[in-house]
């Protein structure tokens, strides 16, 4: 369904597929997996970028996830499978399948798959930057692992 990337169709997220110019339908779960949090998260999955928005079909292995980070783009995550343990701007919650999560632009946040099963979620962001943010502590020293999951 998705065409190969061609000249003039650069994306902000390395490895993402560019939508438009006849490229309108995507089997997002089958796209090449790209890192969706290099240096601070275990998240990875297929990503499609339009002109102003991106959508990712993102996977987090159980017991792993992101360290506290932020990014200039606001974000919605819809949890499809599993449960995320979240903290957004100081507010903690569990987000099971069926939950829509909102992350304001520049809000510090972390999301970790609970130990019982892997998480799949759909990420939707504006394209003020790509899918990857920056860790709040200023380091890109790796993702979060719950004890026993590294």
Q: Where does each model-flagged region fall?
A:
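Short beta-strand segments in beta-sandwich/barrel cores
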Residues: 65-66, 82-87
């Amino acid at each position: 369904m998705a065409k190969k990337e061609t000249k003039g169709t650069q994306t902000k997220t390395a490895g993402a597929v560019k939508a438009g110019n006849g490229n309108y339908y995507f089997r997002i779960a089958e796209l090449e997996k790209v890192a969706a949090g290099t240096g601070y998260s275990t998240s990875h999955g297929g990503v499609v970028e339009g002109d102003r928005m991106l959508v990712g079909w993102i996977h987090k292995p159980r017991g792993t996830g992101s360290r506290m980070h932020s990014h200039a783009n606001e974000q919605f995550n819809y949890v499809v499978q599993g449960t995320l343990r979240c903290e957004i701007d100081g507010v903690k919650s569990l987000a099971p399948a069926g939950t829509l999560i909102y992350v304001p632009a520049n809000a510090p946040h972390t999301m970790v798959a609970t130990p019982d099963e892997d998480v799949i979620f759909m990420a939707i962001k504006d394209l003020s930057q790509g899918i990857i943010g920056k860790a709040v502590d200023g380091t890109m020293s790796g993702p979060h692992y719950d004890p026993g999951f590294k």
